[in-house]
A protein has these predicted regions:
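Short amphipathic alpha-helical segments and their helix-coil junctions
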Residues: 53-71, 111-120
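ATP-dependent phospho-/nucleotidyl transfer catalytic cores
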Residues: 1-3, 71-74
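Active-site activation/catalytic loop segments of kinase-like enzymes and analogous catalytic loops
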Residues: 35-64, 77-95
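An alpha-helical support segment within catalytic cores of ATP-dependent transferases
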Residues: 1-6, 17-18, 64, 108-110, ...
């Protein structure tokens, strides 16, 4: 368990003119699995699976073994589902979230299926 941001998507990363990066909006932070932050980052993108795997390599600074890869990619499904439910609530109270609703739904299904295949040894 490590300190996790909990809402690690691109608008919360600020880059100064000196190219120093800051991470803002810590309201969802707490101790947790670092795969959750990367799962949210990928889940809030429109990356293909191949691009997501490259992001994972960059994040880990190495090519992950199968166990690590499936763990992190499963978190894309888990966090996408979490944010999908959040989005449904927002929509229900008149606060549209735009295309994120569909992206999170799609990634929940896509990465959930991929992760299941990886856990079952089918990929």
């Amino acid at each position: 368990r490590v300190l996790c941001h909990g809402d690690s998507y691109s608008p919360n990363f600020l880059l100064s003119e000196q190219e120093e990066m800051s991470l803002i909006d810590w309201e969802y932070s707490g101790m947790g699995d670092p795969a959750g932050d990367l799962g949210t980052f990928i889940g809030c993108s429109n990356y293909s699976v191949e691009q997501a795997e490259k992001v994972l390599e960059i994040y880990l600074q190495e090519v992950p073994d199968t166990k690590t890869k499936r763990h992190y990619l499963a978190y894309v499904a888990v966090t996408s589902y979490y944010w999908f439910l959040w989005a449904l609530f927002q929509e229900s109270v008149g606060k549209p979230v735009g295309e994120f609703l569909y992206t999170w739904y799609r990634f929940t299904r896509q990465y959930g299926q991929l992760s299941l295949e990886l856990y079952l040894g089918e990929k």
